[in-house]
Amino acid sequence: MNTSSQGTVRKWGLALLPLALLLADLALLSAQATHPDAAWATLPFKITARLLAIAFALALWFWTQALIGSRKGGPAIGDALHDWTEPWNTHLQSRPKLANAILIVSSAFIDFFGLFLIAAGLFGPTLRPFVGLLVVFVFRQICQALCTLPIPPRMIWRNPGFPSLLVTYGVANDFFISGHTAIAVLGAIEISRLFPWPFGLAAALVAFGEALMVIVLRAHYTLDVLAAIAASFCAATFALHLCAAFGI
């Protein structure tokens, strides 16, 4: 990480202070709601706590906006996680066999999650897992039709020499949103709903690994990954209510 990146990290790190104060204040508000008879839960204390929450949120907003405004624009997409993981990417650039192995393993997990969502919807008590997958797919393809992003420099994306059922190695310009991340996160959500928590935790760790992998390989930008995580939770919630409403 260069000196400029280190300075940026320190400046953004300062934003953790108002964020921590905001979270602490929200915890106080929650405690006031669950202990309404406490001396620190009277109306004046509640109003004060709410005012502080608003103040901390505004401080966080203006501080982070100032940091964003101080950045210099450019023709390329800036990605801090690409910068921070550059040593890992460089390591894989010089070790193609290791990079291929990572591609194979990550694609195998995507095949597993995708087939699980389809099978769970087909043979399980509800069609919800498949509907969630369908919602993510439709949203992603709409984004692909409307948005085109430049290929990240030093991207590692190729056919590793082992077939995959769902991963299309021949397509190398489908960035927003990350299909790897979306399928993995949605799979982890459904596994946590259908199985005991250790299985959900294991699936969540795999999903985290998938997200990290596409960043290190430069197969996606950070914005692709973050949007995919949000889209997966939205799709899972939408599918839950939709299937419950229609009894499917």
Stretches with model-predicted labels:
Residues 68-83, 90, 119-204, 210-211, ...:
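Membrane-interface loops
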Residues 2-9, 28-114, 149, 163:
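N-terminal transmembrane-helix/juxtamembrane module of multi-pass inner/ER membrane proteins
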Residues 5, 9-26:
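Multi-pass membrane proteins that catalyze or facilitate reactions on polyprenyl-/lipid-phosphate substrates
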Residues 24-26, 137-142, 205-215, 233-237:
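Aromatic-anchored segments of alpha-helical transmembrane domains
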Residues 19, 50-62, 108, 112, ...:
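Alpha-helical transmembrane spans of integral membrane proteins, capturing the lipid-embedded, hydrophobic core
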Residues 13-17, 45, 49, 53, ...:
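Alpha-helical transmembrane segments of integral membrane proteins
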Residues 169-173, 215-223:
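Membrane-interface helix caps and helix-loop-helix hairpins in membrane proteins
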Residues 183-184, 210, 220-243:
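Alpha-helical transmembrane segments that form the membrane-embedded catalytic/substrate-binding core
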